[in-house]
């Protein structure tokens, strides 16, 4: 009996000590009991409220990841809502109805409470109203379907159209489908749905390619003329050249042909043409040059090159005549050279300038035949389109810079002596310059 009483006394003493400790804790807390609820523990609240102004304020929407996000977020760091939509991690995360998903990067997303977000944005001096639309909106989540990529007007590729619409809803922006498939969109949309079937390019597309290349060649030509560079003049064997097949076009087209012809064989092979295939999305560039190869030998001669570009433009004589008429207006200017055109809009073989009393021979594109200019009527019965023996004439647009680079066949002595070449090139006394 005495042993039982002793045990009861020990238990009572232990219970009394626990009660006294609890009473002391209540007194330290201002006389208010927490009833055993850890949410009212000020020490715990202080730990989780380290980003709040007042100690002990509990945020029922608090999230550890969310607090870590705000710890590193600064007013100068925007909320990354403009990540690549196809890799948006928020598309795979579902937040509670009181929170919104914010993407930190392409792999990390956090759920942030509306209350915490508004509070932090106020502290940062950001007007939360500008975020209320895209952040607080209820955007429809996309189902899991087989990918059917589309390119949006914002330049991003979306796995399917629903994700494009979802991203537009989240950002509060207007995003439309620019084209089907991955970005960037091709300049010309294929008419065939099969990727294995090559689309044939139309004549209009060939003309557009020719015009773009011609403008590009002209810009390069003018830039090269303005910025003359010192270079080493290469002198290949004279026997390698056939002067009867020189380029018939003496403008930027002929200039570009000579720049591409790196082995000086007066032919362009695929390796020399490859530098022009710059835009992989331009499907008709390679097809255009394939159409230039009339002999189907995988080589483009200088005549094929010139004719290929010239046939893709409006009739040259009619174009020049129209331009002259536009400049003159109603009154005809005295002394103005007026080209003679055939019924198809190309140049007649014989051209004359009445004011100076001279006539000369040209091909159908207006390229003057070397040595054909005389006082009086010229005899132009030769088929000059295939003779290749053309001079510059009134249509010569090459500069002295090209003379220094390309005049390599004037005299055999020039080939043997490079130093003598430089002096001869600067001497304008040679009336028989031939351009390569």
Swiss-Prot record:
Compositionally biased residues, Acidic residues = 399-430
Ranges for domain Thyroglobulin type-1: 314-380
Instruction: List, for all copies, the residue spans of the domain called Kazal-like.
Output: 133-185
Segments for region (Disordered): 393-436
User: Per UniProt, which keywords does this protein have?
Assistant: Calcium, Disulfide bond, Extracellular matrix, Glycoprotein, Heparan sulfate, Metalloenzyme inhibitor, Metalloprotease inhibitor, Protease inhibitor, Proteoglycan, Secreted, Signal
Which Pfam family is one of those matched by this entry?
Kazal_2
Sorted alphabetically, which CDD domains does this protein's record hold? EFh_SPARC_TICN3, KAZAL_FS, TY
Q: Where in the cell is it found?
A: Secreted, Extracellular space, Extracellular matrix
Q: Where is the signal peptide?
A: 1-21
Tissue and organ distribution: Expressed in brain.
Residues carrying a glycan:
387, 392
Cysteines engaged in disulfide bonds, as pairs: 90-101, 95-111, 139-169, 142-162, 151-183, 317-341, 352-359, 361-380
- Molecular function GO terms recorded: calcium ion binding; collagen binding; extracellular matrix binding; glycosaminoglycan binding; metalloendopeptidase inhibitor activity
Q: Which SMART domains match?
A: KAZAL, TY
Give any single GO term for biological process: negative regulation of cell motility
Q: What is its main location?
A: secreted
Q: How is it modified after translation?
A: Contains chondroitin sulfate and heparan sulfate O-linked oligosaccharides.
Question: Main role?
Answer: May participate in diverse steps of neurogenesis. Inhibits the processing of pro-matrix metalloproteinase 2 (MMP-2) by MT1-MMP and MT3-MMP. May interfere with tumor invasion.
- What's this protein's name? Testican-3
Source organism of the structure: Homo sapiens (Human)
């Amino acid at each position: 009996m005495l042993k039982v009483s002793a045990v009861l006394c020990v238990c009572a003493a232990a219970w009394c000590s626990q009660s006294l400790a609890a009473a002391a804790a209540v007194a330290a807390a201002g006389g208010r009991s927490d009833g055993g609820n850890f949410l009212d523990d000020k020490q715990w609240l202080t730990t989780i409220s380290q980003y709040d102004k007042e100690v002990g304020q509990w945020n029922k929407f608090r999230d550890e990841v969310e607090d870590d996000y705000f710890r590193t977020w600064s007013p100068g760091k925007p909320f990354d809502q403009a990540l690549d939509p196809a890799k948006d991690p928020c598309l795979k995360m579902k937040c509670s109805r009181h929170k919104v998903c914010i993407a930190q990067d392409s792999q990390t997303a956090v759920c942030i409470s509306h209350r915490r977000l508004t509070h932090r944005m106020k502290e940062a001096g950001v007007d939360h109203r500008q975020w209320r639309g895209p952040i607080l909106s209820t955007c429809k989540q996309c189902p899991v379907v087989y990918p059917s990529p589309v390119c949006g007007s914002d330049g991003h590729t979306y796995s399917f159209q629903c994700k494009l619409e979802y991203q537009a809803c989240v950002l509060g922006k207007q995003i439309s489908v620019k084209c089907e498939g991955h970005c960037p969109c091709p300049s010309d949309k294929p008419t065939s749905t099969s990727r294995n079937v090559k689309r044939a390019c139309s004549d209009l597309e060939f003309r557009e390619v020719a015009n773009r290349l011609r403008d590009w060649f002209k810009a390069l030509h003018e830039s090269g003329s303005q910025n003359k560079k010192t270079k080493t003049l290469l002198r290949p064997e004279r026997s390698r050249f056939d002067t009867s097949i020189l380029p018939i076009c003496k403008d930027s087209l002929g200039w570009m042909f000579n720049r591409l012809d790196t082995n000086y064989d007066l032919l362009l092979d695929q390796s020399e043409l490859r530098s022009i295939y710059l835009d992989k999305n331009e499907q008709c560039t390679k097809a255009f040059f394939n159409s230039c190869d009339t002999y189907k030998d995988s080589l483009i001669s200088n005549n094929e090159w010139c004719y290929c570009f010239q046939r893709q433009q409006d009739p040259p004589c009619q174009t020049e005549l129209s331009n002259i008429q536009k400049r003159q207006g109603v009154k005809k200017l005295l002394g103005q050279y007026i080209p003679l055109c055939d019924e198809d809009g190309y140049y007649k073989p014989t051209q004359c300038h009445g004011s100076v009393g001279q006539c000369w021979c040209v091909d159908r594109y207006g390229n003057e035949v070397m040595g054909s200019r005389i006082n009086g009527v010229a005899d132009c019965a030769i088929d000059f389109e295939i003779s290749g023996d053309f001079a510059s004439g009134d249509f010569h647009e090459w500069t002295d810079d090209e003379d220094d680079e390309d005049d390599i066949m004037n005299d055999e002595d020039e080939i043997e002596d490079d130093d003598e070449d430089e002096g001869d090139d600067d001497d304008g006394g040679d009336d028989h310059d031939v351009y390569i």
